[in-house]
């Protein structure tokens, strides 16, 4: 299995605001076999910003995109996130098995 990661940088929202929504999104993603990780920058010019990494099987990329688009829990979480955070960047990377 080849794993793909989507790495996103977000700006906005406090820990108290972001955490409950992130927990909901993580649970919704897990139903689709997507791994979700949230981190907060603690140094540098992005202090206080968020780094989100989601990982999934590359072969399932298109299928997962369609499933997420139809998943009400995911769409609700995306709408909530948009109220307090702005996505600064998003990159898709292929994970290498070394």
Predicted regions and their residues:
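Non-catalytic surface loops within mature trypsin-like serine protease
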Residues: 12, 56-58, 94-96
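Long, low-complexity, Ser/Thr/Gly/Pro-rich intrinsically disordered segments that act as flexible linkers
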Residues: 43-46, 91-98
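Short, well-ordered beta-strand segments in beta-rich or mixed alpha/beta enzyme
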Residues: 2-9, 37-69
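An amphipathic, aromatic/His-enriched active-site/gating alpha helix that lines ligand/cofactor pockets
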Residues: 20-37, 55-91
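Solvent-exposed, flexible loop/coil residues
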Residues: 51, 82, 97-98
